Amino acid sequence: MTEHAILVLEDGTVFEGDAVGANGLSVGEVVFNTALTGYQEILTDPSYAYQLVTLTYPHIGNTGCTDQDDEANKVWAAGLIVRDVPRRPSNWRSQISLSDWLAARGVVAIAGIDTRKLTRILREKGAQHGALMAGEIDVGKAQDAAHQFAGIKGMDLAKVVSTKQGYSWYEGQLDLDRNECKRAAPQYKVVAYDYGVKLNILRMLAERGCDLTVVPAQTPADEVLALCPDGVFLSNGPGDPEPCDYAVAAIKTFIMRRVPIFGICLGHQLLAQAVGARVVKMSHGHHGANHPVQDLRSGRVMITSQNHGFAVDEATLPNNVRVTHRSLFDGTNQGIELLDVPAFSFQGHPEASPGPHDVDVLFDRFITMMAAQS
């Protein structure tokens, strides 16, 4: 028999549905994501830590799950909210159904609710604190949990999701025809800061000839410089960049030493903070794989993958920083470059996973930048 589940928002709204994962209680910031595919990649993306993810596409789970699609070694999202989960997945790569995968990973999830109504609430009122409860239901307890959640603003989540020890990475993207990872001869020594890095980012860098050393978020700049890197990569990650003063301090050192820098997502915001800009909390953020972004230099419009709840305040950028990309949804900043130092960053996810690869050329730009410096 199907277990019951509820979703309670901080504004008092209660949604009733069916449990499609583990039983229990989970709290977080409720957000909506407009991607049609890639649910497994989304749930294992560390950038979704402490978030209850609503997927707006109605049928989620059609293709099942496979270990090869994980973006980290665990599920980082706080929970999953969907309209419908098909009973039988159909895909030649599928190893397990989404429901069984969620239960095995201990993820609380709800299906059978009006996700269109929920999305409209989040769009109009902004991201809400919420609580998911499955199994034994206690609405009052769930309401208390939703109200007691402190929220993501002010939380330093980068050091929570980051690796505790440094490691090397060599594998490129998976070649499905051969069932093996592509490899390229290493040409550039790159240190990648793990603020919540996705595996596909490391794969795309390795595939372009980067000899990668991944280091914890709080690694001091002098330890990185001792490795004599050709470039430093600032990864994606969850939460508010404001508490990450250790990261800003390290980035300032790299800028001063003119080490080539490429940042994405949280790394983009940290680079902006390092040059003196402010980062502000957005109403409901950008979460999806269909976000149009314009390259202001060429005028070209690209469809991008996005996942962030904070944005760089362009008005606070100094004169030596040029805005390179802007969202066509709301005009928020999507990219910057320093005019006097080899450093640039992008707010979205050029590695996609899930999503389009319109902006994966940014990885090539990083390679070109390192080649010019060397």
From Swiss-Prot:
InterPro entries: Anth_synth/Amidotransfase, CarbamoylP_synth_ssu, CarbamoylP_synth_ssu_N, CarbP_synth_ssu_N_sf, Class_I_gatase-like, CPSase_GATase1, GATASE
Alphabetical list of Gene3D superfamilies matching this protein: 3.40.50.880, Carbamoyl-phosphate synthase small subunit, N-terminal domain
Pathway stated in the Swiss-Prot or TrEMBL entry: Amino-acid biosynthesis; L-arginine biosynthesis; carbamoyl phosphate from bicarbonate: step 1/1; Pyrimidine metabolism; UMP biosynthesis via de novo pathway; (S)-dihydroorotate from bicarbonate: step 1/3
Glutamine amidotransferase type-1 domain ranges (all copies): 189-374
GO biological process: 'de novo' pyrimidine nucleobase biosynthetic process; 'de novo' UMP biosynthetic process; glutamine metabolic process; L-arginine biosynthetic process
E.C. designation(s): 6.3.5.5
Protein keywords: Amino-acid biosynthesis, Arginine biosynthesis, ATP-binding, Glutamine amidotransferase, Ligase, Nucleotide-binding, Pyrimidine biosynthesis
Chain residues that bind L-glutamine: 47, 237, 239, 266, 269, 307, 309-310
Catalytic site: 265, 349, 351
A GO MF term: ATP binding
Signal peptide residues on this chain, from the entry's feature table: none
Substrates-to-products reaction catalysed: hydrogencarbonate + L-glutamine + 2 ATP + H2O = carbamoyl phosphate + L-glutamate + 2 ADP + phosphate + 2 H(+)
CDD domains named in the record: GATase1_CPSase (cd01744)
Enzyme class, first EC level, given as a word: ligase
Region entry CPSase, spans: 1-186
NCBIfam families, alphabetized: CPSaseIIsmall, PRK12838.1
Complexes and interactors: Composed of two chains; the small (or glutamine) chain promotes the hydrolysis of glutamine to ammonia, which is used by the large (or ammonia) chain to synthesize carbamoyl phosphate. Tetramer of heterodimers (alpha,beta)4.
Family statement: Belongs to the CarA family.
Role of this protein: Small subunit of the glutamine-dependent carbamoyl phosphate synthetase (CPSase). CPSase catalyzes the formation of carbamoyl phosphate from the ammonia moiety of glutamine, carbonate, and phosphate donated by ATP, constituting the first step of 2 biosynthetic pathways, one leading to arginine and/or urea and the other to pyrimidine nucleotides. The small subunit (glutamine amidotransferase) binds and cleaves glutamine to supply the large subunit with the substrate ammonia.
Protein name per the record: Carbamoyl phosphate synthase small chain
Organism in which the protein naturally occurs: Xylella fastidiosa (strain Temecula1 / ATCC 700964)
Gene for this chain: carA
